[in-house]
């Protein structure tokens, strides 16, 4: 099913689109967290630290691919909002062909570079082999990552955010079951978790293809899936590359921070891994609320409906703030039982609790910055989102480097560097937003 977001009441339309996105990411985060919980409980702290230190590199590759899909999805949304079905078809087929070639090459490079990249991150020698094996399995399955993210982004661009959620729910349950089977029953350790993740994502791809062929006429292309429109490739690459670089910049900053944490020892790494999984429950849904804003705004921008574009932007910001407040309260009140889900060691639990409580104090800031970025993406100005993300990560890493190695601060003070990064984003984004509003561009 598709949904025309250029008509109807703005608030219910945006909420209806946003909720499946948020739920989908919560399910995805749940099975990511399940990897950590199962590894931590059934394999041990070393394996948990290895999975945690591998996660930034794994996420970098996934987010880069997701960024390509997100950028192409904006073009699909704009064409769909304008009622240009032929352009939608050609945009989808061109992205599918170019993305397949890219993801295969990218996957091979990632597998080959897994060891040197982990060494660059200063991963301790005792957990390096575990981390390498985990990463290589995940990287080998990046073709499935591309196809799922591409198909899901395309459905969302056409206003269908619910279908991808249903597939992801099924995949999440199977992934958790696979984790338990491969790790607890077969004793395959962290490699079993990685294999379970890849297989569950492959299933998502199959389900998406079946659904599209049955329910979405505009994507039932048949042989037209093989149509490659070189005239659309330049815009696709420009949007996709800028969006991918924005996503990659954010993750590169996280990798640099992970490298700093790695100097604090295995206990700090395990605590950081557990707390960061909870952090993901704050940041990822906030990003997806912004993605919902992008879709609604892009469709209406393509249809030339400026007032609906503005209404969608401010409605999305309100949703961001409410979510940030709720999660802040939960993490402040229940930090200890949450961290205890991941590890049993009292020292690691104490480190994780202190980190999480400090991090939760800043949860409103990424809500605002993500909302503003969603607005600029919806208007097609991806350079603003890239620049602001670079500022965020640059200042975050600089602040972390000063706090931890130079001032010898404890792990719990690391989230202060996050706040400094988000503040730099706001200082850059707010004047541009005010200018857009004054010039009636938004």
Predicted regions and their residues:
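Interfacial/gating helices of multi-pass transporter permease domains
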Residues: 39-59, 126-130, 190-193, 232-239, ...
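Residue-level signal for short hydrophobic patches within transmembrane helices
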Residues: 7, 11-30, 34, 57-64, ...
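Small-residue-rich hydrophobic transmembrane alpha-helices
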Residues: 48-108, 145-164, 271-335, 366-380, ...
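Short alpha-helical transmembrane segments in multi-pass integral membrane proteins
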Residues: 1-18, 76-141, 185-241, 297-362, ...
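Helix-terminus/linker motif at the lipid-water interface of multi-pass membrane proteins
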Residues: 26, 30-49, 118-125, 181-188, ...
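Transmembrane helical elements of multi-pass membrane transporters/channels
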Residues: 16-35, 137, 171, 200-204, ...
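Generic alpha-helical transmembrane segments of integral inner-membrane proteins
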Residues: 22, 26, 30, 34, ...
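Short runs within selected transmembrane alpha-helices of multi-pass transporters and secretion channels
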Residues: 69, 137-156, 164-172, 193-208, ...
